[in-house]
Amino acid sequence: MLLLPLLLLAGRFPGGDNEDALQGPTSYHVMQISSFTNSTWTENRGSGWLEDLQIHRWDSETGTAIFLKPWSKGNLSDEEITELVELFRVYFFGLVRELRDHVTEFQMK
């Protein structure tokens, strides 16, 4: 989702190291690890990777995204970033609720 704004940003400022930015496919990956320590405590960790460079991470304690590079927000406004962070919060909350509702089916205790 953030890949397109990053590529557009690179395209707007050609020259230097940015010349090759649009020449080949670029991958953006999101990794998530959820730890269910007991029936009441869950920790979610996440990271966003542009090729082999980590540009985001998820802070489970504060429930927000940490941007590791000054340019990693792309061309998104603060309002759009807030909406994306809220979307991830809802996702993590829903995932935890669904897994807890079906814990007996997964044979986890």
Swiss-Prot record:
Expressed on cortical thymocytes, on certain T-cell leukemias, and in various other tissues. It is found in: Cell membrane; Endosome membrane; Lysosome membrane. One of its GO terms (cellular component) is plasma membrane. The keyword DNA repair does not apply. It comes from the Eukaryota. Glycans are attached at N38, N75. GO terms for biological process: adaptive immune response. Residues 1-18 form the signal peptide. It is a single-pass type I membrane protein. Keywords: Adaptive immunity, Cell membrane, Endosome, Glycoprotein, Immunity, Immunoglobulin domain, Lysosome, Membrane, Signal. Its main location: membrane. InterPro entries: MHC_I-like_Ag-recog, MHC_I-like_Ag-recog_sf, MHC_I/II-like_Ag-recog. Gene3D superfamilies: MHC class I-like antigen recognition-like. During protein synthesis and maturation, CD1 family members bind endogenous lipids that are replaced by lipid or glycolipid antigens when the proteins are internalized and pass through endosomes or lysosomes, before trafficking back to the cell surface. Interaction with saposin C is required for the loading of bacterial lipid antigens onto CD1B in the lysosome. Heterodimer with B2M (beta-2-microglobulin). Interacts with saposin C. Antigen-presenting protein that binds self and non-self lipid and glycolipid antigens and presents them to T-cell receptors on natural killer T-cells. This is T-cell surface glycoprotein CD1b.
